[in-house]
A protein has these predicted regions:
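C-terminal anion-handling pockets and recognition modules
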Residues: 82-146
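Amphipathic alpha-helical protein-protein interaction segments
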Residues: 14-18, 51, 75, 79, ...
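Preference for well-ordered, secondary-structure-rich cores of eukaryotic proteins
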Residues: 43-44, 57, 64, 69
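Residues that form ligand- and interface-recognition hot spots within folded domains
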Residues: 1, 49, 66, 71-73
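Short, solvent-exposed loop/turn segments at secondary-structure junctions
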Residues: 2-7, 50-52, 76
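Acidic/histidine-rich, metal-coordinating catalytic segments
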Residues: 39-53, 79-80
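Electropositive, glycine- and tryptophan-enriched low-complexity nucleic-acid-binding patches
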Residues: 1-40
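Surface-exposed helix-capping loop/turn segments at secondary-structure junctions
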Residues: 33-43, 118-124
Length: 146
């Protein structure tokens, strides 16, 4: 997810670990940034503290490619704007009249709905970050409406 919209979706077969995450960064992220004309040195990359994100391999990859990483507080995945984008996508997929028949139809629907996400959805999620962080501080790290 970028300030000006979503990148293209990438399908993952199986369980993601640090190795697969780094491969996605190398292949999919690099290709996406090139497609959109983005320079990694001008990007602040945000991710939560999931073990695959903090793996030595992924950390080294980011350092080697000149990305700045936004520091992220422990135990706060719900602050991550992408979690709200996943929720948006799930709601859209739930609007279909019938369940998909098989994984291929599900993936086709995911791609269709992902590409329909307007840049304003991403902008609103990112712009909501100060409010969400303030709510967490006010709740002393406890639960918030977000």
């Amino acid at each position: 997810m970028l300030w000006d919209g979503v990148e293209y979706a990438c399908k993952i077969d199986g369980k993601m670990d640090g190795e697969l995450y780094t491969k996605i960064l190398q292949d999919e992220l690099q290709e996406s940034l090139a497609f959109y004309g983005k320079d990694p040195s001008t990007i602040t990359f945000q991710q939560d503290n999931d073990p695959k994100h903090k793996s030595k391999k992924a950390t080294t990859w980011f350092e080697d490619h000149g990305f700045k990483i936004l520091p992220w507080p422990a135990q706060s995945p719900d602050l991550n704007p992408i979690e709200h984008l996943w929720d948006h996508l799930k709601r859209k997929l739930g609007e279909y009249e019938r369940a998909p028949v098989g994984i291929l139809e599900l993936w086709e629907r995911v791609q269709v709905e992902w590409e329909k996400i307007e840049p304003e959805v991403c902008q609103n999620l990112i712009e909501s970050m100060p409010r969400r962080v303030a709510a967490v501080v006010k709740a002393k790290g406890g639960h918030t409406k977000y």
